[in-house]
């Protein structure tokens, strides 16, 4: 079988959104080469990797995303859809150079191309993400999440996912009921379940994303705790069910739009954990949530990104 290797040159801030878009368009796998991550890893004080200044400079500034689609796809139509998706993302984030082109590669080349990029990743102090084929011996207190590269494993490295994971780990209790808005690959829903959530409901507006999330949920043996479906928040009946934690790793515009609805779906004294917010939009999100009766209790920042926790003192 042959594959189309589609290359997109983007920015660190837009890489997660772009890789998620390519996955939902049907990519068999997505490889992300982020010079910022490479530099960060190499420059750690305890890193065993060595690189001279010339190599570090050669990495450049662009995040290169390679997405692999089966060659049976209409490539012209696919490229048009990708360009349209990039235009949509560019309304909220700086996407950089954008679509650079494609190559046709053999099945063997494809497998060589993506496997080398996927290794076990320490997402937080005790949460590890690993590709399905990699062996990993966890420590006693570590939680291991399995992700298949065809399901955009690379997106778990993004700062917004890391911060949401840290906050879920901090605030999760054994009897917690969680709603994951804009679940994407389902990674946060699975993490919530592994951390002891009683029940997790995952929703997304994209049907392909929901399919991917369901596959990931099954892969991690959490189908009894986690359900995923195509829906928007208003499809859920607030009078029938409320949640202890709502998590939303989405863009600032959507968070602001949802801020008036969130309190209706939270139990009294419950939490709204949100990220996907660039620093420049932080205050807008704070203002919107506080206007709707929520109070900010914690803020995390990584790179250009912000995550926040809001408490809802009363249910509506």
Swiss-Prot record:
A GO BP entry: methylation
Q: What InterPro entries does the annotation carry?
A: Ribosomal_L11_MeTrfase_PrmA, Ribosomal_PrmA_MeTrfase, SAM-dependent_MTases_sf
Q: For this protein, what is the EC number?
A: 2.1.1.-
Q: Where does S-adenosyl-L-methionine bind?
A: 161, 182, 204, 249
- Which GO MF terms does the UniProt record name? protein-lysine N-methyltransferase activity
Record CDD domains:
AdoMet_MTases (cd02440)
Q: Which UniProt keywords apply?
A: Cytoplasm, Methyltransferase, S-adenosyl-L-methionine, Transferase
Q: Name one GO cellular component term.
A: cytoplasm
Annotated localization: Cytoplasm
Secretion signal: which residues? Answer: none
Catalyses which reaction? L-lysyl-[protein] + 3 S-adenosyl-L-methionine = N(6),N(6),N(6)-trimethyl-L-lysyl-[protein] + 3 S-adenosyl-L-homocysteine + 3 H(+)
**Family to which the UniProt record says this protein belongs:** Belongs to the methyltransferase superfamily. PrmA family.
- Record-linked NCBIfam families: prmA
Function of the molecule: Methylates ribosomal protein L11.
Q: What is this protein called?
A: Ribosomal protein L11 methyltransferase
Q: What taxonomic lineage is listed for the species of origin?
A: Bacteria, Bacillati, Bacillota, Clostridia, Eubacteriales
What's the gene? prmA
């Amino acid at each position: 079988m042959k594959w189309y290797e589609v290359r997109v040159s983007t920015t660190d801030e837009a890489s997660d959104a772009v890789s998620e878009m390519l996955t939902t368009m049907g990519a068999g796998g997505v490889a992300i080469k982020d010079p910022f991550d490479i530099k960060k890893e190499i420059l750690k004080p305890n890193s065993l990797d060595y690189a001279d200044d010339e190599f570090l400079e050669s990495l450049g500034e662009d995040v290169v995303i390679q997405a692999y689609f089966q060659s049976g796809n209409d490539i012209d139509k696919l490229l048009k859809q990708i360009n349209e998706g990039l235009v949509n993302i560019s309304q909220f984030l700086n996407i950089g150079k954008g679509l650079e082109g494609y190559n046709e590669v053999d099945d063997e080349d494809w497998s060589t191309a993506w496997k080398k990029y996927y290794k076990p990743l320490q997402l937080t102090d005790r949460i590890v993400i690993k590709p399905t084929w990699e062996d990993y011996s966890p420590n006693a207190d570590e939680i291991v999440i399995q992700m298949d590269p065809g399901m955009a494993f690379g997106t778990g490295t993004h700062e917004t996912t890391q911060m949401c994971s840290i906050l879920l780990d901090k605030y999760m209790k054994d009897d917690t009921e969680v709603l994951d808005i804009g679940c994407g690959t389902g990674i946060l829903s699975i993490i919530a379940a592994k951390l002891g959530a009683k029940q997790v409901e995952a929703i997304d507006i994209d049907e392909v994303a929901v399919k991917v999330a369901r596959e990931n949920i099954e892969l991690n043996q959490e189908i009894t705790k986690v359900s995923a479906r195509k829906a928007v928040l208003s499809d859920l009946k607030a009078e029938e069910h409320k949640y202890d934690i709502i998590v939303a790793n989405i863009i600032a515009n959507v968070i602001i739009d949802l801020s008036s609805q969130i309190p209706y779906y939270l139990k009294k004294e419950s939490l709204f954990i949100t990220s996907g917010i660039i620093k420049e939009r932080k205050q807008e999100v704070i203002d919107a949530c506080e206007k709707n009766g929520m109070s900010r209790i914690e803020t995390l920042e990584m790179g250009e990104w912000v995550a926040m926790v809001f408490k809802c003192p009363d249910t509506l």
